[in-house]
Design a protein with these regions (language model features):
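Core segments of cupin and vicinal oxygen chelate
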Residues: 18-62
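Short glycine-/small-residue motifs
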Residues: 58, 132-133
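Vicinal oxygen chelate
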Residues: 19-24, 81-130
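Short helix-capping and inter-helix turn/linker motifs at the boundaries of alpha-helical repeat units
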Residues: 6, 71-72
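N-terminal beta-strand motif that seeds the catalytic metal site of vicinal oxygen chelate
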Residues: 1-23, 78-83, 137-146
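A short, acidic/glycine-rich surface segment
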Residues: 2, 63-69, 108, 140-142
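Residues that flank catalytic or metal-binding motifs in active/ligand-binding sites
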Residues: 11, 45, 54, 77-79, ...
Length: 146
Protein backbone atom coordinates (compact mmCIF):
# COMPACT_ATOMS: atom_id res chain seq x y z
CA UNK A 1 0.00 0.00 0.00
CA UNK A 2 1.30 3.45 -0.93
CA UNK A 3 1.41 6.05 1.80
CA UNK A 4 -0.86 9.03 1.19
CA UNK A 5 1.15 12.26 0.88
CA UNK A 6 0.44 15.14 3.23
CA UNK A 7 -1.58 17.79 1.35
CA UNK A 8 0.62 20.57 0.02
CA UNK A 9 -2.26 23.06 0.04
CA UNK A 10 -4.60 24.29 2.77
CA UNK A 11 -7.45 26.01 0.99
CA UNK A 12 -8.51 28.02 -2.02
CA UNK A 13 -6.63 31.31 -2.43
CA UNK A 14 -9.12 32.73 -4.91
CA UNK A 15 -11.37 31.90 -7.84
CA UNK A 16 -10.94 33.91 -11.05
CA UNK A 17 -14.01 34.58 -13.18
CA UNK A 18 -14.08 36.12 -16.65
CA UNK A 19 -17.11 38.40 -16.83
CA UNK A 20 -18.95 40.19 -19.61
CA UNK A 21 -19.64 43.37 -17.62
CA UNK A 22 -17.19 44.10 -14.81
CA UNK A 23 -19.22 47.01 -13.40
CA UNK A 24 -22.48 45.06 -13.10
CA UNK A 25 -20.81 41.94 -11.69
CA UNK A 26 -18.80 44.00 -9.19
CA UNK A 27 -22.03 45.76 -8.15
CA UNK A 28 -23.72 42.37 -7.73
CA UNK A 29 -20.98 41.06 -5.45
CA UNK A 30 -20.58 44.29 -3.47
CA UNK A 31 -24.00 45.95 -3.40
CA UNK A 32 -26.16 42.82 -3.42
CA UNK A 33 -24.00 40.29 -1.55
CA UNK A 34 -22.17 42.76 0.70
CA UNK A 35 -18.65 41.86 -0.45
CA UNK A 36 -15.87 44.49 -0.62
CA UNK A 37 -13.45 45.45 -3.36
CA UNK A 38 -9.99 44.70 -1.96
CA UNK A 39 -8.00 45.49 -5.11
CA UNK A 40 -8.27 46.52 -8.73
CA UNK A 41 -6.26 46.38 -11.94
CA UNK A 42 -7.66 49.10 -14.21
CA UNK A 43 -5.19 48.17 -17.00
CA UNK A 44 -6.63 44.62 -17.37
CA UNK A 45 -9.42 45.54 -16.15
CA UNK A 46 -10.09 43.45 -13.05
CA UNK A 47 -11.51 43.76 -9.55
CA UNK A 48 -10.72 41.60 -6.54
CA UNK A 49 -13.70 41.14 -4.21
CA UNK A 50 -13.99 39.37 -0.87
CA UNK A 51 -16.53 38.50 1.80
CA UNK A 52 -13.75 38.37 4.39
CA UNK A 53 -13.28 34.61 3.94
CA UNK A 54 -13.02 34.03 0.20
CA UNK A 55 -11.73 36.10 -2.69
CA UNK A 56 -13.03 36.19 -6.25
CA UNK A 57 -11.15 37.89 -9.06
CA UNK A 58 -13.43 39.40 -11.70
CA UNK A 59 -11.74 39.79 -15.08
CA UNK A 60 -13.44 41.86 -17.79
CA UNK A 61 -13.43 39.99 -21.12
CA UNK A 62 -11.80 41.88 -23.95
CA UNK A 63 -14.75 41.90 -26.35
CA UNK A 64 -18.04 41.43 -24.42
CA UNK A 65 -20.11 41.45 -27.62
CA UNK A 66 -18.10 38.46 -28.92
CA UNK A 67 -17.81 36.58 -25.62
CA UNK A 68 -18.94 32.96 -25.71
CA UNK A 69 -21.04 31.83 -22.76
CA UNK A 70 -19.81 28.74 -20.91
CA UNK A 71 -21.80 25.59 -21.66
CA UNK A 72 -21.60 23.49 -18.50
CA UNK A 73 -22.51 20.32 -20.40
CA UNK A 74 -19.98 20.76 -23.21
CA UNK A 75 -17.00 22.75 -21.91
CA UNK A 76 -14.23 21.89 -19.50
CA UNK A 77 -13.86 24.46 -16.75
CA UNK A 78 -15.71 25.98 -13.84
CA UNK A 79 -19.24 24.53 -13.70
CA UNK A 80 -20.39 26.99 -11.03
CA UNK A 81 -19.23 28.83 -7.93
CA UNK A 82 -20.88 27.63 -4.70
CA UNK A 83 -21.05 30.01 -1.75
CA UNK A 84 -22.03 28.95 1.77
CA UNK A 85 -24.70 30.76 3.77
CA UNK A 86 -24.68 30.46 7.59
CA UNK A 87 -28.32 29.53 8.21
CA UNK A 88 -31.67 28.82 6.57
CA UNK A 89 -33.13 32.25 7.37
CA UNK A 90 -30.08 33.86 5.78
CA UNK A 91 -30.45 31.69 2.67
CA UNK A 92 -34.11 32.64 2.28
CA UNK A 93 -33.43 36.36 2.83
CA UNK A 94 -30.53 36.24 0.36
CA UNK A 95 -32.73 34.54 -2.24
CA UNK A 96 -35.34 37.31 -1.96
CA UNK A 97 -32.66 39.98 -2.50
CA UNK A 98 -30.72 38.17 -5.25
CA UNK A 99 -33.84 37.17 -7.23
CA UNK A 100 -34.81 40.85 -7.60
CA UNK A 101 -31.31 42.06 -8.54
CA UNK A 102 -31.09 43.57 -12.07
CA UNK A 103 -29.65 41.14 -14.60
CA UNK A 104 -29.87 38.06 -12.36
CA UNK A 105 -31.50 34.96 -13.83
CA UNK A 106 -32.83 32.47 -11.27
CA UNK A 107 -32.32 28.83 -12.29
CA UNK A 108 -34.19 27.50 -9.27
CA UNK A 109 -35.46 28.74 -5.90
CA UNK A 110 -34.31 27.25 -2.56
CA UNK A 111 -34.81 23.49 -2.54
CA UNK A 112 -33.22 20.36 -1.12
CA UNK A 113 -29.99 19.31 -2.79
CA UNK A 114 -30.72 15.71 -3.70
CA UNK A 115 -32.31 14.10 -0.65
CA UNK A 116 -30.95 16.80 1.65
CA UNK A 117 -30.32 17.99 4.22
CA UNK A 118 -28.47 20.71 2.27
CA UNK A 119 -30.71 23.43 0.82
CA UNK A 120 -29.57 25.51 -2.13
CA UNK A 121 -30.56 27.78 -4.99
CA UNK A 122 -28.85 28.59 -8.27
CA UNK A 123 -28.65 31.81 -10.26
CA UNK A 124 -26.73 33.40 -13.09
CA UNK A 125 -25.25 36.71 -12.02
CA UNK A 126 -25.48 39.73 -14.40
CA UNK A 127 -22.54 38.52 -16.56
CA UNK A 128 -23.98 35.00 -16.80
CA UNK A 129 -21.72 33.13 -14.34
CA UNK A 130 -23.59 30.38 -12.45
CA UNK A 131 -23.53 30.81 -8.68
CA UNK A 132 -25.01 28.42 -6.15
CA UNK A 133 -25.89 29.57 -2.64
CA UNK A 134 -26.14 26.78 -0.08
CA UNK A 135 -26.95 26.15 3.55
CA UNK A 136 -25.95 22.80 5.01
CA UNK A 137 -27.30 22.16 8.53
CA UNK A 138 -24.57 19.53 9.08
CA UNK A 139 -21.96 22.29 8.80
CA UNK A 140 -23.98 24.54 11.10
CA UNK A 141 -23.87 21.82 13.77
CA UNK A 142 -20.12 21.33 13.26
CA UNK A 143 -19.52 25.08 13.69
CA UNK A 144 -21.48 25.08 16.96
CA UNK A 145 -19.31 22.26 18.31
CA UNK A 146 -16.05 24.21 17.84
Amino acid sequence: MTEQPIPATFGVDHVGLSVRDLASTRAFFCDCLGWRVIGERPDYPAAFVSDGHDMVTLWQVEAPDRAVAFDRRANIGLHHLALAVADRAGLDALYERVAKWPGVVVEFAPELSGKGPKIHFMIREPSGVRIEFAFDPRLEEARKQR
